[in-house]
Amino acid sequence: MKIFLDTANLEEIKKGVEWGIVDGVTTNPTLISKEGAEFKQRVKEICDLVKGPVSAEVVSLDYEGMVREARELAQISEYVVIKIPMTPDGIKAVKTLSAEGIKTNVTLVFSPAQAILAAKAGATYVSPFVGRMDDLSNDGMRMLGEIVEIYNNYGFETEIIAASIRHPMHVVEAALMGVDIVTMPFAVLEKLFKHPMTDLGIERFMEDWKKYLENLKK
């Protein structure tokens, strides 16, 4: 399973890359606006750091506008993946962009039916929103599992990115389902490291080592 960071913060991305566990990044206009950064410049900076897929979202909602923006964004770096909303015009744009060799990520997916359309259009990635679906019906993980099963049934090449991840159990459950990628906020990534027994074990080891050193001095 690949791990993506859902952020536009360069310091968070640097830490994840230094840990050696981050394979890519997903962004959106909201995340970039929070950083106060110029959009295209920040996308380039992220691509330079990650050397892996970086999803950058279009803001147009019409077919022509999405395709135009996508072509411009794709010029920034070979790592750029274009995030396209799950709409009729969006799916049409995905079909066009896929034919041109431009990688796409269909976002704001909330049902298996939508995920089928994304795969049929040739999307590189599809992003089901687990946490937001949980907010509505507590069925986020079930939706994700159904998408995994459908894609396996038909051998779709579109990779599934579990998005809107709220806590470590989302990550574990997605991994158990065989999801290709999980994208998460930096805070959730940090939580994956933590377990009270790990902290207790380190504390005990350090106490024993301290006693050992004290005994050597006697």
Swiss-Prot record:
PROSITE patterns: TRANSALDOLASE_1 (PS01054), TRANSALDOLASE_2 (PS00958). GO terms for cellular component: cytoplasm. The keyword Cytoplasm applies. It comes from the Bacteria. It is an enzyme of class 2 (transferase). It catalyses: D-sedoheptulose 7-phosphate + D-glyceraldehyde 3-phosphate = D-erythrose 4-phosphate + beta-D-fructose 6-phosphate. Pathway: Carbohydrate degradation; pentose phosphate pathway; D-glyceraldehyde 3-phosphate and beta-D-fructose 6-phosphate from D-ribose 5-phosphate and D-xylulose 5-phosphate (non-oxidative stage): step 2/3. Coiled coil: none annotated. Transmembrane segments: none annotated. One of its GO terms (molecular function) is transaldolase activity. It is found in: Cytoplasm. One of its GO terms (biological process) is pentose-phosphate shunt. Its EC number is 2.2.1.2. The keyword Transferase applies. The active site is at K83. Keywords: Cytoplasm, Pentose shunt, Schiff base, Transferase. Transaldolase is important for the balance of metabolites in the pentose-phosphate pathway. Does not show fructose-6-P aldolase activity. Belongs to the transaldolase family. Type 3B subfamily. This is Transaldolase. It comes from Thermotoga maritima (strain ATCC 43589 / DSM 3109 / JCM 10099 / NBRC 100826 / MSB8).
